[in-house]
Amino acid sequence: GAAGFSTGRSDNHVSVTGEATPASESEARELAGIAKAFEGLSHGVLQAVSDFDMPKGPDRFEAEFDVLERMAEGASGHPLSISLMQRDMEPDQWRRILARVERATARGVPMRVQVAPRALGVLLGLEATFHPFMGFPSYKAIAHLSLAERVAAMSDPAFKARLLTETSEKVA
């Protein structure tokens, strides 16, 4: 049968109440321990989705990558796949990820990167933590309203026209 473990370590991975998901706060030792469970198996997939603490500043990148590298080291030869993405807040971070993965694999740590051509598993909606309108000034002005009130406001042709003239702030 199939076996795998995936961890989400992103500030976008939060519960509906805004709390971080449990794995996003896991330490290297815990993730390496989970990865060690694959020891002796002929199969198994390990994956990590991380923003490398980008919203907290670029200086956090190395420490976050170290956590994932420790996980890969504990995986007994099973490669750790890391999602590679480019975000507006640090557009060249993908280069840092590739450089670290190359150094790790040169030392025998099995790491890979994968690129999603589109957002997979992203739930969008006005009640979700992330949606296409959240960075626009017009939407931000009504964000505090109930869902029904927001839907009514957004149905107004004048609101639509105004929103279409705006530029969203960077939200991811």
Model-derived features: positions:
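Polyanionic/metal-chelating signatures
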Residues: 20, 38, 65, 69-78, ...
